[in-house]
Amino acid sequence: MVILDETACQNTPNTSRVLYESGSKNVIAKIPDRIKINMIGFQSINCKSYVEATKKSNAYTFLISLCNFRILNSENEECCKLINEAINHPNLSEKNIKKEISKNLSSEYDLINKINDKLYDDNSKEKSINSIRRICNKEDPNNKAKIERRKRININKNLENPKIKELTNKEKRINLVLDNARIHTAKMIEKAVEILNINLISLRPYCPDLSPIEDVWRVIKKTTYKTKYNSANELINLFKDKYYEIIESKSFYENWLDQNDINF
């Protein structure tokens, strides 16, 4: 059983608070630049816990985190190697994806014809401009949406290696409790968890307090708020150190297990 959640941590709190002692004022040293990190944590009850920083919060980065957690909790070395190769394959680099996209783009001659067709077909000048803009975006190899879409396609293909599923099915099945965030219910995630032998168990909607990992976040943020650091990397390391220091404490999830009649 594993409880998963994402959180953001920053050096500037969302709410301003002034802390006073008798006859004096507490001053907490903070660097002037805003530092913010996104973290995803796996609070494990009967396997290895894990936490990592993520640059973005989307289905693709969530899938990478699931794969890293599966690797950590797999005994077969070949299984770990194949999953690691799948998520670090050259076909996932932005440079190679741009090359891949460029192969399917229209020739310069065809592109000019497409633009000319839209330029003279529409009665409205505004419609013509919008149509031409869409064509140019579609034909742009640097189009971010296109690159992200191709990344998702490629990583799913990489994981569809039959050997990966064969080996993960021999590993201990992971039951993962998480909220109903949109990225957790994406189709690419549904396909991936089947391959990785992970069972997703959703909490009731709009009930984040039902997740015991929320208490873990509170303890960590109390520490980061009182500690001085000078960069995002220092904050990430501080967060990870505190996470692994406290995550094994049963006090975070014992009541939650009792309330849900879960026995281990």
Predicted regions and their residues:
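Extended, low-complexity cationic-aromatic segments
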Residues: 1-72, 76-80, 84, 89
